[in-house]
Amino acid sequence: MTFTAALLTLAASAAAEKPRLDMVAFFTGHTRTESVLKVALHKPVPLIVDSVGGKGDKGDFVMIDTVHEGNKPVRTRKWIMRPVGPNHIRGTLTDATSPVDVVVSGDSATITYVMQGGLKVEQHLQLQPDGRTLSNHVVAKKFGLKFARVDGTVRKLD
């Protein structure tokens, strides 16, 4: 094998290996989510979420979000999550009326839950090549119709 062929093989192998998303490792410590919230029939508003996550006293993962949504008063919400199988996490969120379900697949995760008023939320997170940023896309539906959408990024700060 020539040197050039070896380099091309190595480059192809490295490109084929996607980074794996470890939700607990990513969200342990401080993260900041910067997004735009688009609700049907309303103007888009900035949605900024500052989060602190870590191990809870019962061995679970706990994350506290400070949510800045447009001109609304700042609010907090709390996630409590536990692994329930390989690449599968389940728990609670103060905004949710159903359990929160997280399925991780390679470099991405899908989070689903139901909010007050019957809004069904589906969130997709995709790890970016830098390993410290996630793309964040959320759709909230009611009666099968898209009611709201969030698009932005999550950055690991420490």
Name the predicted role of every residue range.
Residues 1-3:
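Bacterial N-terminal signal peptides that target proteins for export
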Residues 5-15:
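Hydrophobic h-region of N-terminal signal peptides that target proteins for export
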Residues 17-30, 80, 129:
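N-terminal helix-cap/turn-to-beta initiation motif at the start of protein domains
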Residues 21, 30, 37-40, 55, ...:
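Extended interaction-bearing regions that mediate binding to partners or small molecules
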Residues 24, 44-46, 118, 131, ...:
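Short coil/turn motifs at beta-sheet boundaries
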Residues 27-35, 135-136:
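A short, Trp-centered hydrophobic/proline-enriched beta-strand micro-motif
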Residues 34-116, 120-126:
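Central antiparallel beta-sheet cores of small beta-barrel/beta-sandwich binding domains
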Residues 125-133, 137-158:
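Edge beta-strand at a domain terminus
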